[in-house]
């Protein structure tokens, strides 16, 4: 699919259905975990198990939550320069409610994507006013603004490990009317238990990372004024 001998081009973003099915064929073990987690939500399980669906959107009262498969091109030999398929990314963006805040949920960070993939993905995120990306993978916290446009919050290791890694979790809040919020990080400090990380921000309250998004109406007005 990708690489020197692959056909994939981020500008068109097409991944052939046969390849999507092949890429998803080896996930039986993962699907069994999903079936247990979402035992009361069979429709969610079907989204994960669909042989042709790479990404999908779950709409709640206030949010569009996009489950973005960032591991489709991952191998032991290819752990960076990943792709998500910009055509299926466009398809799932087109399903969102423009008046709700959209959140991308992935395993890998935006930084792990191929440079061409990053460029096209950023253009699509701008077009659809997507300004929040939540990722895992890193066994530490990483909170930042990407490309002077969207916020990416990366965290997600609850297993105690030795060495430089930390068992930590990010907890946030978001005001759906003001379109702003904040994040705090809690890390496991044995034997004292969960402790707030006191130094995750340069704001006056160093233990809280604050952020603000542009709401859809403001963005629409800016575009209209340019046109």
Predicted regions located by residue number:
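A short local loop/turn or secondary-structure capping micro-motif enriched for an aromatic residue
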Residues: 74-76, 161-162, 190-193
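Residues at the C-termini of beta-strands that transition into short coil/loop
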Residues: 2, 69, 156, 187-189
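Conserved beta-sheet core of the metallophosphoesterase superfamily
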Residues: 1, 17-26, 111-183
């Amino acid at each position: 699919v990708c690489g020197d001998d692959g056909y994939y081009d981020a500008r068109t973003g097409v991944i052939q259905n046969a390849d999507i099915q092949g890429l998803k064929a080896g996930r039986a073990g993962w699907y069994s975990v999903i079936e247990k987690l979402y035992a009361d939500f069979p429709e969610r399980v079907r989204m994960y198990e669909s042989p042709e669906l790479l990404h999908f959107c779950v709409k709640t009262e206030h949010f569009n939550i996009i489950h973005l498969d960032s591991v489709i091109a991952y191998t032991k030999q290819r752990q960076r320069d990943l792709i998500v398929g910009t055509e299926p990314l466009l398809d799932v963006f087109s399903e969102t409610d423009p008046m709700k805040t959209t959140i991308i949920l992935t395993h890998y960070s935006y930084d792990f994507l191929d440079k061409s993939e990053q460029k096209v993905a950023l253009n699509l995120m701008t077009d659809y006013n997507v300004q929040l990306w939540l990722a895992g993978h890193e066994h530490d916290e990483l909170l930042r603004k990407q490309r002077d446009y969207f916020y990416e919050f990366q965290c997600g290791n609850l297993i105690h490990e030795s060495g430089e890694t930390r068992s930590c979790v990010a907890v946030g809040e978001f005001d759906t009317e003001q379109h702003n919020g904040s994040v705090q990080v809690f890390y496991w400090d044995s034997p004292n238990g969960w402790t707030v990380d006191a130094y995750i921000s340069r704001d006056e309250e160093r233990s809280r990372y604050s952020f603000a998004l542009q709401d859809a109406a403001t963005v629409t007005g800016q575009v209209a004024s340019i046109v």
